[in-house]
Amino acid sequence: MVEDLAASYIVLKLENEIRQAQVQWLMEENAALQAQIPELQKSQAAKEYDLLRKSSEAKEPQKLPEHMNPPAAWEAQKTPEFKEPQKPPEPQDLLPWEPPAAWELQEAPAAPESLAPPATRESQKPPMAHEIPTVLEGQGPANTQDATIAQEPKNSEPQDPPNIEKPQEAPEYQETAAQLEFLELPPPQEPLEPSNAQEFLELSAAQESLEGLIVVETSAASEFPQAPIGLEATDFPLQYTLTFSGDSQKLPEFLVQLYSYMRVRGHLYPTEAALVSFVGNCFSGRAGWWFQLLLDIQSPLLEQCESFIPVLQDTFDNPENMKDANQCIHQLCQGEGHVATHFHLIAQELNWDESTLWIQFQEGLASSIQDELSHTSPATNLSDLITQCISLEEKPDPNPLGKSSSAEGDGPESPPAENQPMQAAINCPHISEAEWVRWHKGRLCLYCGYPGHFARDCPVKPHQALQAGNIQACQ
């Protein structure tokens, strides 16, 4: 059940990380595009300014003839003043037209001098003056009415310039308005040349790909143990604190977090011993004390994480109440085996202070161990006292064969209570038969529960006698 919850938790967490990476990538892409907008606006504004300048330069030579048309119109208006005495239809009067035409040629340059026009106007007016005689010469044999008809379109020329200038002025206002609109409201779709657009897309795509790779490397390499090669980088910080103080109510939550961490970052710990050491560093309080005891006795559980986790779960997630633990710790006594582990397992369920546990631990020690402790330097805390006891218990026995032969002789019978180091643990419900199975998996002695030998080589009692003692204790 816990593994299923851990698996579902990991799946949800991975999906969340992927969504967060996608959102971050989109935000960076949006930021990159927004950073490119001012440059595009500047380039577009420069292009618009160049187009407006070119269009204004192209329109300037067209405006010059407009200003030059009024003098030409004035000349066309002056001709009828000289032609008024020519109204009689006498054919002889047609000959004197030549002097007025020549006189007009002289007056044409005089009029621009009084008005002081630029040189461009002077260069353009002589053709106007020459055109008038040519028209008049072609109309010489014709009637004066034809001349007046030919002059009427010329008289209408002064009316054309204002009409022509009005539509030319309107685009100027429209262009200025267009400039203001361009500056105030930048268009979302700016026209770009195909080559510029391709370069911009290539540059933006390259930048976004590099930034995306950096983000993915920092997150995926730390969160996914089987990430592709090249994406492994610095570890991503945990979103929760992986700690356990020994509270049985918080153990399931700690195990879920631990399983998810092992699935995600298990590759960071090449050996099971390194992983167990990491888990032990997360302990505090009673759990830290229990782990320190395993370090002191060099338990094989420290080398196998698969055996360490079940023992941890059975130790701190046992429904044993404080009353039973209180009874068991008073019944605990030492025979010829270790008592430190059993004392520590029972003390987990009690809220006693260190001084009380110190006194109770000394009461459960064998007299030989107490005598040896009196000749050594006193310990400063309970952990040092337990370490001294373990070192004294592990001293070689001068007559192990005699003990083993006596143990074998007493095999069919139930051993006395003082020769059973696990008698109190067997009587205590905290030590169950499932724990013996875990000791077997942890390569511990199935009789005393400590490393260095197996049950068949145990100097106290063989494995068969231990099973018989368990059956009698249960009965």
Swiss-Prot record:
Q: Where is the composition biased (Basic and acidic residues)?
A: 51-66, 78-87
| The entry's keywords | Metal-binding, Nucleus, Zinc, Zinc-finger
- Report the GO molecular function annotations: nucleic acid binding; zinc ion binding
Q: Does the keyword Zinc apply?
A: yes
Keyword Cytoplasm included in the entry's annotation? no
Identify the GO cellular component terms for this protein. nucleus
Q: Which InterPro entries does this entry report, sorted A to Z?
A: DUF4939 (IPR032549), RTL1-rel (IPR032567), Znf_CCHC (IPR001878), Znf_CCHC_sf (IPR036875)
* Disordered as annotated region, ranges: 51-101, 152-173, 397-421
Q: Where are the zinc fingers (CCHC-type)?
A: 443-462
Q: Which cysteine pairs make disulfide bonds?
A: none
Coiled-coil segments on the chain, per record: none
Its localization reads: Nucleus
PANTHER family assigned to the protein according to its UniProt record, in alphabetical order: LDOC1 RELATED (PTHR15503), RETROTRANSPOSON GAG-LIKE PROTEIN 3 (PTHR15503:SF7)
Biological role stated in the UniProt entry? May function as a transcriptional regulator. Plays a role in postnatal myogenesis, may be involved in the regulation of satellite cells self-renewal.
Q: Other remarks on record?
A: RTL3 is one of at least 11 genes called Mar or Mart related to long terminal repeat retrotransposons. They do not correspond to functional retrotransposons, but rather to neofunctionalized retrotransposons genes.
* Name the record gives this protein: Retrotransposon Gag-like protein 3
